[in-house]
Amino acid sequence: MLIIETLPLLRQHIRRLRQEGKRVALVPTMGNLHDGHMKLVDEAKARADVVIVSIFVNPMQFDRPDDLVRYPRTLQEDCEKLNKRKVDYVFAPAVEEIYPHGLEGQTYVDVPGLSTMLEGASRPGHFRGVSTIVSKLFNLIQPDIACFGEKDFQQLALIRKMVADMSYDIEIVGVPIIRAKDGLALSSRNAYLTAEQRKIAPGLYNVMNSIAEKLIAGNRELQEIIAIAEQELNEKGFRADDIQIRDADTLLELTETSKRAVILAAAWLGQARLIDNQSVTLAQ
């Protein structure tokens, strides 16, 4: 496994891979890797000749400076995990390599609508940062496929739209959420949880299951369902942030013709803002 930190060296290897006709898969990450990331790697390995994992804590997508500062950085441990998984390349650039002139005045990629709705409304600028860095990685690495986790449901929808709108010839693969045995979705931010909070954390998944059962049963009193869910979360020790029930295919409000719903949940537990989602097939 080769660790690449500079753009010239990356471009050199990408040119060689293209000349050799290799099928390249990209797994973009911010590091602090867990089993969910490893599932992305496994999916990439099954679909391509060469797997490149990027590790870059992207300052452009953080809406709070304190969150950027304390985001876990575990490059050595991450590389050890990826080496065991027989990843071919790790691209781990410094911030100055990606943004040599700083963020002020940086050209950015914005995806209208999806960037500012739902999660984007509560985290201004976040998705603009995501689409910009992913676009830069696509331009640099020129992958045939790229793997993203379905845990970040809105992010995956945003990337798919960006790829379509910008005419990238890249297959976007969504990989299902990986959960702990108690249902908690794996996330780098779980590291912020204390031992006591970790015991409480699966409550978010349980509340989503309760919402799903109501939707499957035909209940469409969405505001009432959401209000009850928020109350349940607060009683469990969370601070409910945002719960939405949307059309899974458009992320717009549910209509009578919606075939699938997605429950999008975000809640604070101590210093950790946990997000999760669950899709439900609706009775027609």
Curated annotation (Swiss-Prot):
EC number: 6.3.2.1
Amino acids binding beta-alanine: 61
A Pfam family: Pantoate_ligase
InterPro entries associated with the record: Cyt_trans-like (IPR004821), Pantoate_ligase (IPR003721), Pantoate_ligase_C (IPR042176), Rossmann-like_a/b/a_fold (IPR014729)
Record's keyword annotation contains RNA-binding: no
Reaction it catalyzes: (R)-pantoate + beta-alanine + ATP = (R)-pantothenate + AMP + diphosphate + H(+)
Keyword flag Hydrolase: no
GO biological process: pantothenate biosynthetic process
Pathway: Cofactor biosynthesis; (R)-pantothenate biosynthesis; (R)-pantothenate from (R)-pantoate and beta-alanine: step 1/1
Location relative to the cell: Cytoplasm
Binding site for ATP: 30-37, 149-152, 178, 186-189
GO cellular component, one term: cytosol
CDD domains with a match to the protein in the record: PanC
Annotated residues for binding of (R)-pantoate: 61, 155
Active site, renumbered: 37 (proton donor)
Gene3D superfamilies assigned: HUPs, Pantoate-beta-alanine ligase, C-terminal domain
GO MF annotation terms: ATP binding; pantoate-beta-alanine ligase activity
Assigned keywords, A-Z: ATP-binding, Cytoplasm, Ligase, Nucleotide-binding, Pantothenate biosynthesis
Residues that span the membrane, as ranges: none
Note: The reaction proceeds by a bi uni uni bi ping pong mechanism.
Record-stated family: Belongs to the pantothenate synthetase family.
Subunit structure: Homodimer.
Record's function text: Catalyzes the condensation of pantoate with beta-alanine in an ATP-dependent reaction via a pantoyl-adenylate intermediate.
Listed name of the protein: Pantothenate synthetase
Organism of provenance: Salmonella typhimurium (strain LT2 / SGSC1412 / ATCC 700720)
Gene encoding the protein: panC
